Amino acid sequence: MKKFIKSAISFTAIIVLCLSIAGCSLFKAPDKGSIDNIDDSKVLASTLNFATQNVSERKLLTGAEACALVERSVVALEIVYQGGTSYGSGVIIQNEDADANSKIFYIITCHHVISSLGTINVYVPDENGRNFTDGDYNSEYKFTGVIDNKIHTDKAVTLVGGDKDGDIAVLKLNTTGKNVNIVSANVPVEGYSVKKGEEVFAVGNPTGQLPGTYQDGVIGYIEREATINSVGIMSLYQINVDITHGNSGGGLFNMYGELIGITNAGSDENEGLNYSIPFEGTDSFVTVAKQLIATATDSNYGYVSGRWSLGITIADKTNFGLVVNSVETGSDADKAGVLANDVIVGIKYTDKNNQPVSKEVSSSSSFTLVYYEIKEFLTSGDKISLIVNRGSPINQTLELTLTQNIFCDTGFYPTAE
């Protein structure tokens, strides 16, 4: 049986929710075009590259040297939402072809850090490396924005896009009008690959009140499959670097001072067993971030092609089994006729061998196992059926067509030319 590993986000108020398979609230505007008119995100992302070091200047560094090189690229995040405040970390990056005097930067963080929505405060280390907890911190390095299903171009911090499955979100940082010096991180040069046993270090904001903290360790395993609480099954770097609440979204660096991972989870039960989203692979933070940036438009947020979300929350209830708590308006489940208080007893789908499959479900855990299994191969446009009971002897079968999921979807899409 797989254990759920806790994501390392720090909360000042915690609300326990049942399993949620949904994104930001949806608003659809059919007259504004269709998501089908947008090019595939992987094609668009292939034209983007993040900044790397000059190969001639690249060299192995001591821990102190590497930390000094990158620590100002790691920011502290504070999200004030209805019901509380949460904290996390993020890493500043730039496109490879960004102008040296550019006032626009990107911040990569974890999706679960910003998924509660609300006001977001970004605290960038100031020109002297001081952080927001220091009394003499330069407040010019504090930037504010709002995360919801509207585009806020008047804010210094704006959402570019978020991807729940990859646990990556990208923010845009606009420093126009401020006399600040921003340091961005570099991703590894072409040809580099992380090795097991390699020395690494993390910079983040443990507890939400200790920004700029350096913690070192090694890569324990390259492609460790782990089930991350509130995210799902992921292929991650296993590291023994200490990752605690508030570190989520922070940077994992190699001894060249290159950003090789985004820290996202740790285990409260097993000391030294922690995780980071890799820079390599199909769902690497580089791949996901590039797709989010490439597909973002003036009217809607970025996305990763093929991702879908049912749009329901579920819970186990005594004597009732698996019950739908709520259905998101406009979601795939809503369009199929799923109702709050429906009892889900089964799910039907076509597997990757094109064979029909029907599975019974009786609890949130059994439903979750099937859900993450089919997430591996079903994509937007595919169909599944939920078998539900509404108190009668005969069950009902509701067919859902899976549609592209956009976190904080504004409902406005480009119109076909």
Language-model regions, residue ranges each:
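PDZ domains, with a preference for the canonical peptide-binding region formed by the helix
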Residues: 279, 346-387, 393
